């Protein structure tokens, strides 16, 4: 209870800070909010929208968000901007929107409660599928934008999905880089069912705890009632970019599970308090003390929940019981207890977000070089040394030849000058050249122990001047000069000190290698890391099901690409990862794969493996979910239908081509629920859209092939039935 109150006070304090920091943005945009019926030509930027929403915060709640935020024309226009996919269309956004409906009239209907949601529904005959038209999509997007400002900072850090920069790749990256010493884990599995009326009431109750707005609650209930907003738990259609998924699904799922996230967060804090780290940093530096705290890790991507512990199995069982009780009693969800079982992180793999996870020693992720690799590296190093010696000998030979030529040339010029001076001082240039050569020779000489041994032996052998009876008969100046010369020879040419330094360096390298080996051995015995691997068998089954490979797993011709233009085929291939042999062919025939636009820039880029590795994990962003693209086939039609506007949201182009939608499950006559024939975890587009036709311009059909847009980004009222 104390933790809840503390988190609540922190949240209120953060809201107050955000309100105070956003007053400047609010004052600059206040002229847009004074008259809600005035004509708006520019959408709100994010900072202005935050200031507008936070202005409605008072005494721990937000009030009248629909009337004071969602219904404003500037907010609706910002929602249109988010949905707009026609950056190359003529005219500004406000003009393109006004050709379809009036933003001001729509905002007035929303404020007065006259907005008819049912009339904006697109129902498909003989099917339970109901999709929103473009006008209703704008309202849904405006509600989503406002709810995002209200809830995004309030969600737990391990809540992924439906949030900016918090997608599936980021969740997997967190598991890979942050989880240490996992011992036991379990994945919460739900029985496949739709949200029922009781779940909608619970969801609206959670929304009402933070937002006091009857109109918003009624809109959410109507969206559920009319079938536009559907939430299915236990399936594989959430957060995948399918057209049947409403834009509010992700954020409402996060709101529904937010209470569970807070409970898990409190358990993690309590576990840290129970297992404090005793000692100072000096003890850590000795390396003799191993601190292995009991940690609880959790990742939730919408309705997929993974909980990991580094403690005992009894602790994991208690944690599982507590989480399942919250889901079944407080959230009234049906948990599949058979599949929600505890597994050993070391001996068993677990499937989460389409990837296989397993706890392994660090040497599995970063294996040491094998003996064969070490021999190959030594052989390569010897080859480099031989090549370096050859280049050095060639450089000395060329330098000697060039030096003799320079000497002959200078001598010839001096003889021809007869005492006259030239305008250019060739002596200085020659002196600089030979000085630089001499410095390079001396650097090479001083770096070679063999050369120094040789010259030291030549200059010190037969030193009869060191004999006493000889030194007594010679002048003192000659003896002093000889002694000084010998000191300089010993100082600069005696390789004893250099040899000692070299031996110390070799000894240091050996000790460091032994230290690294010892550290790797200790890490393998005391530490576990997370290994993430792709389900290769499922990937092979998927590409075989689509028709990319035959029964033997070998590539086969893709006949459906025949209907595409050459440039579209190349763009289609540009978004697919290549096999090794295909990459070699692409590098060889790169000139044939370069598709340039009117400005001469490449439209499709094929990144190499080296480029991808150099980017690193942190620079890779979460891509747009386009899971339905694999099972979608668009066939270009030769139709006599009159020209239609492009089906993409707010696109004004009328030079469109009609395309027919073919879905994989309908072409193969396979039930996606049959896991033996279908790929487990692979979602599908609703079968009601099979053989529907829609007009698309050349820009947006290319975006479909490149995976930039999906059928979720088109106007649902643009689907046409052609026989």
Swiss-Prot record:
Keyword Methyltransferase listed: no
Q: Which GO terms describe its biological process?
A: Group II intron splicing; homing of group II introns; mitochondrial mRNA processing; RNA splicing
Q: Does the keyword Zinc-finger apply?
A: yes
UniProt entry keywords in alphabetical sequence? DNA-binding, Endonuclease, Hydrolase, Intron homing, Metal-binding, Mitochondrion, Nuclease, Nucleotidyltransferase, RNA-directed DNA polymerase, Transferase, Transit peptide, Zinc, Zinc-finger
The residue span given for the transit peptide is 1-26
Q: Where in the cell is it found?
A: Mitochondrion
What is this protein's function? Nuclear-encoded maturase required for splicing of group-II introns in mitochondria. Necessary for mitochondrial biogenesis during early developmental stages.
Question: By what name is this protein known?
Answer: Nuclear intron maturase 3, mitochondrial
Organism from which the protein derives: Arabidopsis thaliana
Gene from which the chain derives = NMAT3
